[in-house]
Amino acid sequence: MAEKGKRRCSFCGRTEDQVALLMTGMTGYICNECVEHAHDILREEALLPKNDFEMKELPKPKEIKAFLDEYVIGQDKAKCALAVSVYNHYKRLMQRDSADEVEIEKSNIIMVGSTGTGKTLLARTIAKLLKVPFTIVDATVLTEAGYVGEDIESILTRLLQVADYNVEEAERGIVFIDEIDKIARKSDNPSITRDVSGEGVQQGLLKLLEGSVVNVPPQGGRKHPDQKMIPVNTKHILFICGGAFDGIEKKIAQRLNTHVVGYNSVQNRMHIDKGDMMQYIMPQDLRSFGLIPEIIGRLPILTSLRPLDRATLRSILTEPKNSIIKQYVKLMEMDGVKLTFNDDVLEYIVDTAVEYKLGARGLRSIVESIMMEKMFEIPSSGVDSCEITKEYAQKQVEKSTVIKCTV
């Protein structure tokens, strides 16, 4: 029995000669073993899933769309679908600790639209608003395990890296899988031969999309037996898939039994422009294109993006908060130079993008080709202003590879 008068831990009661270290506080003592035990408890608590989103903090669908409007021009239908889906997804995260009998299912999203219509930008902007880890994955580099290419698990490795290997943060992040149409199987019928970069990848994606614990190699690359794995639960990760699905208009037209302008068809019951066909897209069209039914079922929210017309491209050039024109004005401003673009230059940029079907992404390429020489020369020139004329813009674009590569 411990002698009276000896100092003892206020928590476990052990005396100072029974422990390695006894620390003194204002009104009591604590031993090293109790400190270690308290540290373990705190660490376990920190690893427990937390509802980081409170209802009062979570942006409402209208607020999400308003934020998207600041960065993305047009595509109101896709914005509304995305806003509602994201809002419901993060409400679902708030429900996960409750004992509610009604379990809200995941609302993964698939966006269909031609290149340059804003699929990636929409997903990136959503992640920016919610301040959650976000990563973009190109589906074309994915292959089944054991084949040359990237494993499906590499998707989660990238998300972990963005989250600085904070598993809890990664488990509430957003993954954008681009070019999902490129892993479609070649026909609507199941393949009798192994398709390691098509149907095989779709099968591999299923466990990620539906929600399961996946062992992820910490530094990426292939798995090997002696490697330490990081378990990541994908149940609360929001997956947004995007693809151009070139030629799917034919599938839609066949289903609707209509005539599409630009395609030969016997039926001529109603004329719908090719650009409007996407609004009629249904899950069965994705299946006809080559996505397996299981994948389609795990991407319940289907929305389409319209091709960008000239007026929309003109707005994209100058109106968003981070428009390419505003970015170059800011870059020049940092060098003490006032940059101006004549109105006919802006019209020329848009006309070039429309003529060569470059989309919104092409606007940046054109502006960069116009500005490259100026950005090289002006910082050393000592001038305080720079005006871009149409003649100068035409000369620079004609010299660049932007047009040459599209001819």
Regions found by a protein language model. Name each.
Residues 2-24, 28-34, 39-135, 139-148, ...:
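AAA+ P-loop NTPase nucleotide-binding core of proteostasis motors
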